[in-house]
Regions:
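Glycine-rich phosphate-binding loop plus the immediately following alpha-helix
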Residues: 47, 123-218
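N-terminal phosphate-binding loop and adjacent alpha-helix
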Residues: 36-73, 82-85, 89, 194-197
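Short glycine-rich, Thr/Ser-proximal phosphate-binding strand/loop in the N-terminal lobe
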Residues: 15-54, 294
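Adenine-nucleotide phosphate-binding core of ATP-dependent small-molecule kinases
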Residues: 215-258
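Short glycine-aspartate micro-motif
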Residues: 15-19, 74-76, 154-158, 269
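Glycine-rich phosphate-binding loops at beta-strand->alpha-helix junctions
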Residues: 24, 265-283
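Short beta-strand-loop/turn "lid" adjacent to the catalytic site in phosphate-handling enzymes
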Residues: 68-129, 170
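Glycine-rich phosphate-binding/hydrolytic loop that grips phosphoryl groups
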Residues: 250, 292-313
Length: 313
């Protein structure tokens, strides 16, 4: 277990925002003006919790020192904490919908009188069947940021182990699609014959971009193209030295080909903070898409702040 207290000050605590994923936990203590009182990050994600009580115990371990004794502090959570295996299963809102409604933050059971806990539900789509949990809060944050003048219309991409593409019209998510790109990369790179050609390979951006374009133009050939990563290495061809870049480019190119049918615009709001987001930006730019990069961390907090206003109202 690792815990990092990144910031703290002595402002009065008004409420707590929590982003609780599968492998990580982030906690913001906020004042009445949403200024930070404290910020904590930990690797105590849902996967390390044993039962519902463990969630509350873990949260209290980190925030008890900041809690007043004479009142209950609202706590608003998003992410896998609301899954069946989480603190409390809060289900999904069904599309089409605004990712935040007056009914969306759901009160959940807690036992400590110093806390009042709400969790945001995910989003679901009936046909084709799809679900998201956690990303809806980033989408809500983005809509809050971009919809000051008029409701947002456009496409949002959220890269990750399971990448999400969401189509928004007049402030509502009308459809989305999940792509298993990150998980496929891990499985192929670590548990298939490709592992011998990927693990120690050199990175090459030109190889990555070329692979993106190749898979985008020929998505039906992906299985063949993926094996060529191994073949090029065995035959000692130049691109064989860049197996990781080629495999990554092929899989992201396939995803972009699949997302092409969803997009009603050539501009994409790309949400993220890490190197993976930069790869998606490179790939989209190479294919002629206009990309606007948005901070995923900032949008999570902005989405939680927007949801908290729903509770106050």
């Amino acid at each position: 277990m690792a815990v990092w207290l990144l910031r703290a000050n002595m402002k009065q605590l008004d409420w707590i925002a929590v982003d609780w994923g599968t492998s990580s936990l982030r906690i913001w203590g906020l004042g009445a003006d949403n200024q930070q009182v404290f910020y904590l990050a930990s690797d105590e994600g849902m996967a390390s919790m044993h039962d519902a009580q463990t969630f509350e115990t873990t949260l209290l371990k980190h925030v008890a020192a900041y809690l007043p004794a004479d009142k209950s502090i609202p706590v608003l959570c998003c992410g896998m904490v609301g899954a069946k295996q989480g603190w409390h299963d809060v289900g999904y809102q069904v599309l089409p919908c605004n990712p935040l409604t007056h009914q969306s933050p759901l009160r959940v059971p807690d036992t400590d009188p110093r806390l009042k806990v709400w969790i945001l539900p995910g989003l679901s789509q009936q046909s084709p069947a799809d679900v998201m949990r956690g990303e809806e809060t980033q989408i809500a944050g983005l809509l809050s940021k971009l919809s000051a003048a008029k409701p947002f219309d456009g496409m949002i991409c959220l890269p990750g182990t399971h990448s999400k593409w969401a189509q928004v019209e007049t402030g509502e998510v009308i459809q989305f699609a999940t792509f298993l790109t990150g998980e496929l990369f891990a499985l192929l790179g670590q548990q298939s014959v490709l592992r011998f050609s990927v693990s120690d390979s050199e990175w090459c951006e030109d190889t990555f971009v070329s692979a993106v374009k190749e898979a985008y133009a020929n998505p039906a050939q992906l299985s063949h193209l993926v094996f060529s990563v191994r073949a090029a290495d065995v035959l000692a061809q130049p691109q064989g030295k860049h197996g990781k870049a080629r495999l990554s480019g092929l899989l992201i190119g396939l995803e972009l080909a699949g997302a092409k049918g969803l997009a009603s615009t050539k501009q994409v709001q790309l949400v993220g903070n890490d190197d993976l987001t930069k790869l998606y930006q490179t790939a989209m730019t190479a294919l002629g898409l206009a990309v606007v990069v948005q901070s995923g961390d900032d949008l999570v907090l902005l989405g939680l702040q927007s949801a908290y206003q729903q509770i106050l109202e």
